[in-house]
Amino acid sequence: MTTTSAFMLNVRLDNVAVVAIDVPGEKVNTLKAEFAAQVRAILKQIRENKALQGVVFISAKADNFIAGADINMIGHCQNAQEAETLARQGQQLMAEIQALPVPVIAAIHGACLGGGLEMALACHRRICTDDVKTVLGLPEVQLGLLPGSGGTQRLPRLVGVSTALDMILTGKQLRARQALKAGLVDDVVPQTILLEAAVELAKKERLAQRTLPVRERILAGPLGRALLFRLVRKKTAQKTQGNYPATERIIDVIETGLAQGSSSGYDAEARAFGELAMTPQSQALRAVFFASTEVKKDPGSDAPPGPLNSVGILGGGLMGGGIAWVTACKGGLPVRIKDINTQGINHALKYSWDLLETKVRRRHIKASERDKQLALISGSTDYRGFSHRDLVIEAVFEDLPLKQQMVAEVEQNCAAHTIFASNTSSLPIGDIAANAARPEQVIGLHFFSPVEKMPLVEVIPHASTSAQTIATTVKLAKKQGKTPIVVSDKAGFYVNRILAPYINEAIRMLTEGERVEHIDAALVKFGFPVGPIQLLDEVGIDTGTKIIPVLEAAYGERFSAPANVVASILNDDRKGRKNGRGFYLYGEKGRKSKKQVDPAIYKLIGVQGQSRLSAQQVAERCVMLMLNEAARCFDEKVIRSARDGDIGAVFGIGFPPFLGGPFRYMDALGPGEMVATLQRLAALYGPRYAPCEQLVRMAERREHFWTNGETDQGN
């Protein structure tokens, strides 16, 4: 056996070379620039061994093939030329793999992403396991980049241009059966026989060429291709609002390769990669990636977590059902649900059943796996089965006496070490724990709806919460697949506190006569996934406005909303999407395609509905209030760092990730510019825009959130 640092070559007795990939000291395999020499040394041995029948690339890691290229390599590039050179080096290495004179098979188990999939594409055939951990994709667009090692050229030729565009423009990841159907892999097998199946495929002298589906063959022709790219460009521009330059370059590069040939395509790919790597959008998106990775590693406190073997949930409603699903089906923990009636329990069970059944229908999991996961969830109308639960999450109504009663009942019916975690969105955790016998084991755990989709949770200790309770709760959130940030027990916590003035200002502009669709379109153009008015409809107008009095009582008039407007809307039985009417009207089952602004909303609030502000002015008014409040949260140590503030806003409310989060965005604008803009808006619209003390101080000292050592205040 010849051994290198991350690649091991073993020639079997049947003359098939097996190259095992195992980056030392790392949980996952990533491709690094220094590995090129190691791979080339192995390729040289393979070329020189004339007796070889084939080659298999396989990972020695337990649950991943190659998770991608090491993104740090891009950060070391000083200019576009250096990044372009990096791409060309990757392209050359993949070309050398593809040029091997014997069949080359990629045997894939676990994540095969980015540079990992580009390497698999350079192999002659691909075979993967049917494991749920196996996913294949090119997610570079999510970092403001495009695949730089040949992915934009090989993938369209393998699966067809339409499928390739969809994969590369969205960064979507395909599971094993999806990859097989798309033609991305040639076979799907159990993990136990992956190597032998790959070896047998490598021994075949002739590997049959795959024929593209008729639709893809039509789209590959000049006329079909022209129509496809015209439609894709239009659809992509509508979706990105011009905020993500990588998508435009991806389309251009793929089209170049198909129209002018692979050589021109590879050249265009490398140049585009180099240029995109230097864009502020890519730098911001990579910063979000690194920050989220750090947050996921953060234990929350210095204390070791307590036991976490099973969880209880109080309330089987929308939130309770979602929390049960992420706990059992993502976290793998047994869950016991308590509700006052069996209907609530049945609702929670159906919630998980529906999500799992969808996965079965899409062939993401087998029916047996669905049943296995569902078996982790049980329910009761009393506290039977709760005595041994390590942590209990309450998801009942936002009523302080009720939540205090839940604390007392859990302390009476559960173990002495059981943690009580409240999913409150507005009530102080200290008040919920006020009468607790063990207040050190009471904490907030604020999920966002829909629970199965929203990645963020806020972990909220109160003054007496123990360090171990924090660590255990953070550990649970991570097991649930969430990204947790620890925030202070102050009104609104962090996410709702910065969101409220943003939505309030949108409502205020409505009362000034601005049109609903104009306000929403302005913020979508700025980079939010939906506008503030639509967001209020989605959350529920009754639910979304409930926190406003709490915030106004805590922080004063800057949180006041036009109360008469909110009351008029609620009195007209407008709750948003959930009852089919809010600021928008919704068609049958609330389908988005049927959504349209209800003209009656203007009469209801007593305005004509004629927009006078530009889109930039609308966005500025909403966003500046959000940024100012985020800076206050930093100053008051509501968040522990600018890192947590950026991740909380991006993952919790969809703050434009290409701006890096509110704190990176404020740094980009500069504190002096922030203060000047807020002062200008305060002169126009009132003292709610007055710049906070934190920003004024930073402007005077010319400081930044991310560069002055203030990014980790809590530790």
Swiss-Prot record:
Domain of life, source organism: Bacteria
Enzyme Commission number, as recorded: 4.2.1.17, 5.1.2.3, 1.1.1.35
A Pfam family: 3HCDH_N
Compartmental location: Cytoplasm
Keyword NAD: yes
Keyword Cytoplasm: yes
GO cellular component, one term: cytoplasm
SUPFAM superfamilies linked to this entry: 6-phosphogluconate dehydrogenase C-terminal domain-like, ClpP/crotonase, NAD(P)-binding Rossmann-fold domains
Chief localisation class: cytoplasm
Pathway: Lipid metabolism; fatty acid beta-oxidation
Chain spans, region Enoyl-CoA hydratase: 1-190
Catalyzed reactions: a (3S)-3-hydroxyacyl-CoA = a (2E)-enoyl-CoA + H2O; a 4-saturated-(3S)-3-hydroxyacyl-CoA = a (3E)-enoyl-CoA + H2O; a (3S)-3-hydroxyacyl-CoA + NAD(+) = a 3-oxoacyl-CoA + NADH + H(+); (3S)-3-hydroxybutanoyl-CoA = (3R)-3-hydroxybutanoyl-CoA
GO molecular function, one term: enoyl-CoA hydratase activity
GO biological-process terms attached to the record: fatty acid beta-oxidation
UniProt entry keywords in alphabetical sequence: Cytoplasm, Fatty acid metabolism, Isomerase, Lipid degradation, Lipid metabolism, Lyase, Multifunctional enzyme, NAD, Oxidoreductase
Coiled coil segments of this chain: none
Annotated spans, 3-hydroxyacyl-CoA dehydrogenase: 306-715
Site, as annotated: Important for catalytic activity: 118, 140
Family: In the N-terminal section; belongs to the enoyl-CoA hydratase/isomerase family.
Subunit structure: Heterotetramer of two alpha chains (FadJ) and two beta chains (FadI).
Role, per record: Catalyzes the formation of a hydroxyacyl-CoA by addition of water on enoyl-CoA. Also exhibits 3-hydroxyacyl-CoA epimerase and 3-hydroxyacyl-CoA dehydrogenase activities.
The protein, known as: Fatty acid oxidation complex subunit alpha
Annotated organism of origin: Salmonella heidelberg (strain SL476)
